[in-house]
Curated annotation (Swiss-Prot):
Organism: Caenorhabditis elegans
Tissue expr: Expressed in the somatic gonad, neurons, hypodermal cells, seam cells, the excretory system, and intestinal cells (at protein level).
Region described as Disordered: spans on this chain: 19-63, 132-151, 156-253, 561-581, 1112-1308
Compositionally biased tracts (Acidic residues): 1142-1152, 1194-1213
Entry annotated with the keyword ATP-binding: no
Record flagged with keyword Transcription regulation: yes
Compositionally biased region (Polar residues): 37-63, 134-146, 191-203, 210-228, 566-577
PANTHER family named in the record: PROTEIN STRAWBERRY NOTCH-RELATED, STRAWBERRY NOTCH-RELATED
Protein name: Protein strawberry notch homolog
Phylogenetic lineage: Eukaryota, Metazoa, Ecdysozoa, Nematoda, Chromadorea
Principal localisation: nucleus
GO biological process assignments: nematode male tail tip morphogenesis; positive regulation of cell fate specification; positive regulation of Ras protein signal transduction; regulation of DNA-templated transcription; vulval cell fate specification
Highest taxon of source: Eukaryota
Amino acid composition bias (Low complexity), ranges on this chain: 19-28, 161-176, 229-239, 1112-1126
Length: 1866
């Protein structure tokens, strides 16, 4: 047997440790070996090993009881002693374990011939109780032989044995029991049973001389890698004895297999195991096998002679025991290398085990030809038919090279498989019942193994490696068939997998050498790949068995379970891109090192839990009983779940085995059946009904529609059309068909077809299959087609499908066909028209609409003509009638539509549960540099708008008519431009979040909507195909607007003359006037002169706009200096010019200089007077630069700033001004010699003046000290002279800087708008306006602003995250900008480094992400539909997804599609959604739009608008009726029409008068207009939320934040008022969810006539008892005992208490707090109406209530409770009620309240409901949906009908319907 143990040791790399010194004998409690013999000159006395239970109080005594285990051990988390899953108690049916002396004369031990020099283990005898077995003659020898034939590299080691003689005889076995007193009792076991025992002998010459009557045992050794301390057992000795535990009686017999089940406990999911037992009554019962906290441990030492390569191959013996019971014995063995887990199995009777799993006959074995035992033996295969012959032993190195996994088998049909080799853990023995087949392996391994550092092939599939620590596994494999005696192992493991972890050890090896750690990741290559990938190139030591060894002191490679040293490299200067790559590598590394547990989301906020429970309910098919459950939790909105679908009548044709095997889940099958069932019906118009699958993203719509196609295919309808949004989804369609069991249905791409007959020869004669097309290809046309009949794709499809054919048309992702009936001012989309035309042309087709967002808004349902909601003989004749009715009634009407469609069997909408999914909105703080850049862009846009308007106003009517679309283009570009700026502000935060997620062992998905590819390509074309920097998308948008859409006319460009060629001929005075106006505010605008003059010296200031301001103003100053000194050399003054400037601009610049020379000269002279006449000597060049920069900062229109100057300083400055000008003018940093001048000398004087240590050191030191004293004296004198001057200039600079900053950040609107006028046409002379000149000036301004604008967001993100090698990009663009290793930026096609075409690059990137090769994915709209990026259980990359929404989609359908990429079925964990929103108020416009769409989506698509309230974006939803009223109030307040403002203006607005500034700003963005009289008016269509939130993007940051804050305050106030009035629309109203007692009193049923179709509507009369008696109030009071909890009294009459009565209330805190101020919230329970749904703070309560004692409240409570039974609250408090005095029943404050609910097919009687609800005044009142749950647990959802309308509604329904009757409830 020890050859197997040695093989396991070798597999773990521990075989070289097997040579040990002989242990010291001990006689105490030992087992003596009576047959010690000498084998091959090596005498060995075996050591003893004692079993004991660590839970025993006397664990080291020989009487300790050893618990036999039926299952493997599982180690504890902290590396402690492994514990068994199954303990043993009085009824477990244990066995007695004894050790017995070995007997000479037999070489058959444990069914395996002993291997000489093998590892020694104690002899164990396992004695089952209550069973007898034939005795065995232990003395009969058995001498089978074996011949080993080695072969070359990668030997496949297999052996075979023939039948061995069965021992016979009736020899009694003697066992000794050693009690606690140390005495031994001898007893004979032959009358009881023959013991089974496990015994290991030793041999060095290949002979076995020890008898064996043992059970078959399959040992297994696991290397231990955790340090543990052990003490020597008192029983450790070389002598032998026997230990028998106390006998147990009355134990049941175990039978059958172990049953595993998973249950939910308080600690989470746990796996339990049940074992079948036969009790004393003969009954078969199952008992839970409980874990025990201890294990049996054997302690001993290794005997000598345990060398490598000395093992022989054992042969099988015969099982003697006939009881048919298998037992597993597991123990911990303590060897010199720490603990080793030894597992032995006792197999059933008649089983023989051989090393290669053979049965001994006709099986091949291997013979060693030369008798060598090296690792490179040549093996050849032979076959024996009789007794195996003996051969030379095979070395361990040769044997452990087999990585396929040795199989041990037996004749009884059991296979014992040695699995887990090289899987990062150690080898395990595994048994599995087989069908009496041979277990021979005769094929070469094909997996990757490691031997002597080389990669080899090995057949064993790698086991799963634990992500947290190295692990070994017990893996059950399915029974495998055999072919010619060979076992073909199943690749798929069985269900039961028990894994345990290493007890890791850092113990040094006994050889005395350095501590080593085995690299045991052969099969998975995890260690090697990481080591090689990490650049590990050191020479590693090699073990004697050929294994690679590395020092244990080396740094651990993350996740590899091994160590590897890190290379020490010299740091090199890195570029920004290289730094980004290194940071991403570091994030990957940290992510692997830190195995963070997944955060549990069970403890959520109370409000979230409440919202989830109220909004959703777990979904199970209501009328379907077949099919397997969906792999993930699926929910349905509560309102939809209250409606039952119709009965199932359709008989499905899909084979049952596909359904039973889970190819389609039950809820998917439900949609298939209902769709096919609906397809059997016809509409009144004769068209076939369609079906709408509204399941959310990730539920599995693709597989559902694939099954619908499959079902129709089985019915003989073999042609189908599948329309989707992306050609990449064709592969998903094929996958879905394959997964649902229809792999043979072909799928063809329409865009690959020629424009000809599809069934013709040109297209391959396609007669049947699925024609896959995109919506974009559907509108394709080809005028060059041979036949006009096939010129368009839709005509091709119609011809191929057949006009009368009844096949399936799938409109997948049908939200792309929306906007068939768009809003005013837009045109229907061509896609929508094509979809409508296709349905009309094929009236018999079976149409399926499939989309998670198919009905985002009712207007987008226009193409769903097959749902029967409108049309001939429907409730709505035309779609216009339907849309007007639904939109007028709001969200409640949409909920009714969704419920009605489900009730008709037209619609199902389920979605994945949001459990485990977290949502967060994170606002990004804006930097000051970004704010400056943003405000500069705002100024440029304001000036552009002013110039657009000015030029258009000067045109006549005819010219103006050609510019109708200019403003549409302008505002569209305006929105895009600032959207790009908003996104750019979030890039840094996004990169930081991404790196943190990678470090936290997660992966990242970033959502974008646009890629900016068009801007990149446009710029690339302009630059001639070469780019050296990232393209600014924002700059391209603005530049393109001015360049392409600025209104210029030929009459304004002086006829046919070229304005640029004749630029010199323009009148100078006009330009001079413009220049004067421009120059005066350049310091405030943030631009330099309009020609783009810059200088190279200003670059040291900083980044962004500050840099531009400095450069530009430095240029102005230098130009002024040039003019004042008479230097006309413009090249020196104009060192750098803008790209848009041409030669003519230089002359214009000269004019500007001459016009402003005096002003600038005065400014410069003032600066020179302040600074003094400095030279460039004595290392002060840096001071010159500082002076120049200070000059640039102080340059402004206030050139006559008040600077206090001394007269002497003035004269000194004047005398030296000429010299200074000359030096500054001639200064060129590239022409000066700085070798002798150190600009940092004044900061490093001590370093410069330190003398070298030479012979003249002292003298030089004295000289230097003297020179230093002189310099210090001069310096102090200079400082004194300049002290006053510097103080004065600093004082002036601070004042100016303060004014500038206030103007930039919080300047008044007048100053801000004035400073934005770059193009001066303020004279009002129309002759001075030249559009081409203005256009040129605007383009030049754009170029000056461009350096500070952000680059393309997508390219910047990829670059900062390490480049394309780390980021998987799934977008629609063809190329991207990449940074090379040298830092150069270049344009590259996306598939440049890939092996796939550009069409498949997205799929390739997706696969890399799902495989974990890339952990960051960026998706755009092109990849948003259909692509699955969730943590799929089938994927390699199972990390949790962090979905960062960098750019919020503009519509809900796009948002839902993006959210659904990472939240789908079959996922390991739900994603984390992070919505990044900058603090720019205008950007909340996008959040508002998405939130509004999500709310509407939840209402219509999922029947409940609150379904999306868990998404945090709902707080930004302003686009509702409250927002619209608030906007109207805001606009009227700003222009002064609203009188007293509803809300006071923001107090923190300090820039100016708030309303006055907002008027100017809102005029600047087109929201307000000023008429001829100077009065402000509201622009047409300005009072819309989207336009308002879009336009305020164009305001400076401080202004838009203040304005949006003011707008939000108005919205909050309006909502608060509506809640106070009780008119706030909260969605679906719930009855019966709290303590209310709800009963259905009466139901009136109405059924439709035949001509009106079959429908059914019901009016329910619901009674609600909501009062709370005094006894119930006291019970509630006892549960709340805080200080503020208790009874309160209120006087509703106020001061008039004499004529009014008191009302009581019970107030108690509920633990919630307000989100705004953190105040605790309290619930209010009244005696008449119960608990109020409105929560209040104590501050609000104190205004109306005061606390009283219980006795005082009791009387008031009872009186109010009794009165509420028959009067309203008005009568009770005031003694009268105005409502009842008018003859109307008043229910306010009554204990019992009556509701009337209209349910059923409400859409069928919608016109009647509409007429009744509108009333006589035709007001558009809201439609309140109510959900009722009665005491009888009945659910009713419908419309709430007011009591005043009930009588009229009943009359109208009786007239319209064919029959009505009353159903009274008991």
């Amino acid at each position: 047997m020890d050859d197997i143990l040695s093989a396991a040791l070798a597999e773990s790399g521990l075989d070289f440790l097997c040579q040990q010194s002989s242990p010291t004998p001990s006689t105490s409690g030992s087992i003596h070996d009576d047959a010690g013999q000498s084998f091959s000159n090596n005498t060995h006395t075996p050591s003893v090993s004692q079993f004991f239970d660590e839970t025993s109080n006397d664990s080291h005594s020989s009487s300790a009881y050893y618990t036999p285990m039926a299952t493997p051990f599982v180690s504890t988390e902290d590396g402690g002693v492994p514990t068994s899953f199954f303990g043993m108690d009085e009824e477990d049916g244990g066995c007695t374990i004894m050790t017995t002396a070995g007997t000479s004369g037999s070489n058959n031990i444990d069914g395996i011939e002993d291997a000489g020099g093998g590892m020694y283990y104690p002899h164990v005898k396992v004695i089952p109780r209550k069973h007898t077995a034939p005795t065995v003659n232990q003395s009969e020898p058995s001498t089978p032989t074996v011949t080993i034939v080695p072969k070359k590299e990668d030997p496949l080691f297999e052996t075979n044995t023939a039948d061995s003689p069965t021992p016979s005889g009736d020899t009694s076995t003697t066992a000794s029991y050693e009690g606690n007193d140390g005495l031994e009792d001898q007893e004979t076991t032959s009358d009881r049973q023959n013991p089974m025992f496990v015994q290991t002998a030793r041999s060095t010459d290949g002979r076995l001389d020890t008898p064996s009557t043992s059970a078959t045992v399959s040992p297994h050794i696991t290397s231990s890698l955790t340090q543990r301390s052990h003490t020597s057992s008192p029983a450790s000795s070389a002598s032998e004895g026997t230990v028998v535990p106390p006998r147990k009686k009355g134990l049941p017999i175990t039978t059958g297999s172990i049953v595993k089940r998973t249950v939910q406990t308080k600690d989470g999911l746990q796996t339990q195991y049940l074992k079948a037992f036969v009790n004393e009554n003969g009954e078969k019962i199952y008992k839970l096998l409980s874990p025990v906290a201890a294990s049996a441990v054997a302690r001993g030492t290794l005997p000598p002679g345990m060398g490598r390569g000395g093992s022989t191959i054992g042969r099988g013996g015969t099982m003697v025991n006939k009881n048919g019971e298998r037992l597993m014995v597991v123990k911990n063995h303590v060897g010199p290398n720490g603990q080793m887990l030894v597992k032995r199995m006792v197999s059933p009777a008649g089983t023989r085990i051989v090393a290669n799993g053979g049965q001994g006959r006709g099986q091949p074995i291997y013979r060693a030809v030369d008798g060598s035992n090296g690792p490179t033996h040549l093996l050849r295969r032979t076959t024996t038919t009789g007794q195996p012959t003996r051969g030379a032993p095979v070395g361990m190195a040769a044997r452990h090279a087999v990585r396929g996994g040795t199989v041990y088998g037996g004749g009884n049909g059991y296979r014992v498989n040695l699995v887990g080799r090289g899987t990062g853990g150690s080898t395990m023995v595994h048994h599995q019942p087989l069908n009496r087949i041979s277990s021979q392996r005769s094929v070469a391994p094909v997996g990757r193994v490691l031997n002597r550092g080389a990669l080899r092939n090995g057949a064993q599939q790698p086991l799963h490696v634990s992500t947290s620590s190295p692990a070994f596994h017990y893996m059950e494999e399915q029974p495998s068939p055999t072919t010619n005696g060979m076992v073909i192992q199943a690749k798929t493991p069985g269900a039961g997998v028990i894994q345990a972890r290493h007890m890791q050890s850092q113990q040094s090896f006994p050889s005395g050498g350095p501590a080593r750690v085995l690299m045991n990741r052969s099969s998975t290559n995890a260690g090697l790949s990481r080591m090689v990938g990490g650049g590990y190139d050191q020479q590693l030591p090699t073990a004697p068995n050929g294994r690679l060894m590395i020092p244990s002191t080396a740094v651990r490679v993350p996740g590899s379970g091994m160590a590897s040293p890190r290379l020490q490299t010299t740091p090199q200067p890195l570029t920004k891109s290289q730094k980004a790559k290194d940071e991403m590598k570091m994030a990957y590394q940290v992510g692997r090192e830190e195995a963070l547990q997944q955060r549990r989301n069970d403890l959520e906020d109370d409000e979230e839990n409440l919202g989830y429970a109220e909004t959703y309910s777990e979904y199970t098919p209501a009328k379907l009983r077949s099919g397997m459950a969906h792999p993930d939790s699926v929910v349905e909105s509560a309102s939809l779940s209250s409606v039952s679908p119709p009965d199932v009548k359709y008989q499905i044709s899909i084979p049952e085995y596909l359904i039973d095997m889970g190819h389609i889940s039950a809820l998917q099958l439900e949609a298939v059946i209902y769709a096919c069932q609906m397809h059997e019906r016809r509409m009144p118009s004769g068209e076939r009904y369609g079906y709408l699958i509204g399941d959310g993203a990730g539920v599995g719509k693709g597989r559902t529609v694939a099954c619908i196609i499959f079902e129709n295919y089985l019915q003989g309808r073999k042609r189908a059309i599948w329309l989707s949004v992306s050609s990449d989804l064709k592969f998903d369609a094929e996958r879905d068909l394959r997964d649902c069991g229809a792999p043979n249905i072909p799928v063809y791409a329409l865009n690959k077809m020629k424009y000809a007959k599809i069934s013709g020869k040109e297209n391959g004669s396609i007669k049947k299959g699925v024609m896959f097309a995109t919506y974009t290809s559907l509108i394709g046309e080809c005028r060059g087609a041979k036949s006009r009949k096939y010129r368009s794709r839709i005509s091709q499809l119609i011809q191929w499908f057949g006009q009368d054919y009844d096949g399936v048309i799938i409109l997948d992702e049908c939200h792309r066909a929306k906007n068939l009936v768009p809003t005013a001012g837009a045109k229907p989309t061509k896609t929508g028209r094509m979809v409508l035309e296709l349905q009309k042309a094929l009236p018999n087709a079976r149409v399926v609409y499939a989309s998670a967002t198919g009905a985002t808004e009712p207007r987008n349902m226009a193409y769903m003509t097959r749902l029967g909601l409108w049309g001939e003989r429907q409730a709505f004749p035309e779609f216009h009638d339907f849309i007007s009715a639904v939109e007028r009634r709001g969200v409640g009407a949409m909920e009714i539509v969704a419920m009605d469609m489900k009730q008709r069997g037209l619609y199902l909408a389920r979605q994945l549960s949001f459990r485990g999914v977290s949502f967060a909105v994170q606002e990004v703080q804006l930097s000051s540099e970004f704010v400056k850049m943003y405000d500069a862009a705002v100024k440029l846009w304001m000036e552009a708008r002013r110039q657009f308007q000015t030029v258009i106003e000067t045109m006549d009517e005819e010219e103006r008519s050609t510019c109708k679309t200019v403003w549409g283009q302008f505002w569209a570009c305006h929105q895009r431009f600032f959207k790009y700026l908003c996104i750019a502000a979030k890039v840094d935060t996004c990169v930081q979040l991404s790196r943190e997620a990678i470090k936290a062992k997660k992966c990242v998905v970033i959502g974008l909507q646009s890629t900016g590819e068009s801007a990149t390509l446009e710029t690339l074309e302009e630059m001639g195909g070469e780019l050296n920097e990232f393209v600014s998308t924002a700059k391209t948008v603005l530049y393109g607007l001015i360049d392409k859409h600025f209104p210029t006319d030929a009459s304004f460009s002086m006829g046919d003359r070229d304005i640029f060629k004749d630029f010199d001929d323009f009148e100078r005075p006009a330009k001079r006037r413009k220049t004067r106006e421009t120059l005066s505010f350049l310091g405030d605008v943030g631009f330099d002169t309009w020609t783009g003059v810059t200088t190279g010296m200003g670059g040291r200031v900083g980044d962004g706009v500050t840099k531009n301001i400095t450069r530009g103003l430095s240029g102005i100053g230098r130009s002024s200096m040039s003019s004042s000194t008479g230097n006309t050399n413009n090249e020196d003054a104009n060192s750098t010019t803008s790209e848009s400037s041409d030669g003519s601009d230089d002359e214009v610049e000269n004019d500007m200089i001459s016009e402003n020379g005096g002003e600038s000269g005065d400014l410069e002279s003032a600066r020179e007077e302040a600074e003094g006449a400095r030279t460039l000597e004595d290392g002060e060049q840096d001071e010159w630069v500082k002076a120049l920069l200070a000059e640039a900062e102080s340059s402004s229109d206030d050139s006559d700033e008040e600077v206090v100057k001394d007269e002497d300083e003035d004269e000194e400055a004047e005398s030296k001004s000429g010299e200074t000008h000359e030096q500054e003018e001639e200064f060129n940093p590239f022409m000066c010699d700085f070798t002798n001048d150190d600009p940092w000398a004044h900061n490093q004087q001590i370093v410069e003046d330190t003398p070298q240590k030479d012979r003249k050191a002292k003298k030089r030191k004295r000289d230097e000290e003297e020179a230093e004293r002189l310099r210090e004296k001069v310096r102090k004198r200079e400082e004194r002279r300049e002290k006053k001057r510097r103080r004065a200039i600093r004082r002036a600079e601070r004042e100016k800087q303060r004014r500038n900053e206030e103007l930039q950040a919080r300047g008044s609107a007048t100053d801000f708008i004035t400073s934005s006028r770059i193009c001066g046409n303020g004279s009002g002379e129309q002759d001075d306006i030249n559009p081409m000149l203005i256009k040129t000036e605007l383009l030049a301004a754009v170029e000056r602003l461009a350096p500070s604008l952000p680059a393309n967001t997508l390219d910047q993100l990829i670059d900062e995250m390490g480049g394309p090698e780390y980021v998987a990009e799934m977008t629609g663009r063809r190329g991207h900008m990449v940074t090379s290793e040298t830092g150069d930026v270049m344009y590259q096609r996306r598939n440049a480094n890939a092996e796939v075409s550009l069409e498949l690059i997205n799929m390739e990137e997706k696969e890399k992400f799902m495989r974990g090769e890339k952990l960051i994915a960026i998706i755009s709209e092109a990849a948003s539909s259909g692509i699955s990026l969730q943590s799929d259980r089938r994927a390699i990359n199972k990390r949790r997804r962090v979905h960062i929404t960098l750019e919020l989609p503009w519509s809900a359908d796009k948002a839902i599609q993006q959210f659904g990429r990472t939240h789908r079925s079959n996922q390991v964990s739900g994603p984390e959604y992070v919505f990044l929103i900058s603090e720019l108020a205008g950007e909340k416009r996008f959040a508002s739009i998405v939130a509004k769409r999500l709310e509407s989506l939840g209402a219509l698509t999922h029947g409940d608008r609150r379904a999306t309230e868990t998404r945090d974006l709902s707080q930004f939803n302003m686009d509702n009726k409250y927002g619209r009223v608030a906007l109207d109030t805001l606009l009227k307040t700003v222009i002064g029409q609203a009188g007293t403002p509803l809300i006071d203006p923001p107090k923190d607005y300090k820039a100016g008068e708030f309303f006055e500034d907002m008027r100017l700003y809102m005029e600047g963005v087109g929201l307000l207009a000023k008429n001829k009289t100077g009065q402000y008016t509201i622009e047409k269509e300005a009072a819309t939320i989207p336009k308002f939130l879009n336009r305020i993007l164009g305001l400076p940051v401080h202004a838009q934040n203040s304005l949006f804050h003011y707008f939000s305050e108005i919205v909050a106030e309006l909502i608060a008022q509506s809640k106070h009035d009780g008119t706030y629309d909260t969605g679906i109203m719930d009855l019966g969810t709290g303590d209310d007692q709800v009963r259905k009193l009466e139901t009136r049923v109405f059924t439709g006539r035949v001509d009106n179709g079959s429908f059914r509507v019901e009016i329910h009369k619901i009674g609600v008892e909501r009062g709370v008696s005094w006894e119930e109030a006291m019970e509630l009071h006892k549960e709340h005992s805080n200080d503020d909890d208790g009874f309160y009294i209120c006087h509703p009459g106020g001061a008039n208490t004499a004529n009014t009565k008191k009302v009581a209330a019970l107030v108690y805190g509920i633990g919630k707090i307000r989100m705004d101020n953190g105040a605790r919230l309290y619930a209010i329970t009244r005696p008449s109406t119960g608990r109020s749904p409105k929560l209040m703070t104590m501050a609000d309560l104190s205004k109306r209530f005061h606390k009283v004692s219980i006795d005082e409240a009791k009387e008031v409570w009872k009186q109010q409770y009794d009165s509420a039974a028959n009067m309203c609250q008005h009568n009770y408090v005031y003694g009268k009620c105005r409502t009842e005095s008018n003859g109307t029943y008043c229910e306010v404050g009554r204990r019992t309240r009556t509701y009337f609910v209209l349910s059923g097919s409400v859409l069928s009687v919608w016109p009647i409901v509409e007429e009744v609800l509108a009333g006589s005044d035709r007001k558009s009142s809201r439609m309140q949906v109510i959900r009722v749950r009665t005491e009888q647990d009945q659910k009713i959802v419908g419309l709430l009908v007011l009591p005043t309308h009930v009588r009229h509604l009943v009359q109208q329904l009786e007239t319209h319907c064919g029959r009505s009757y009353v159903k009274t409830e008991p």
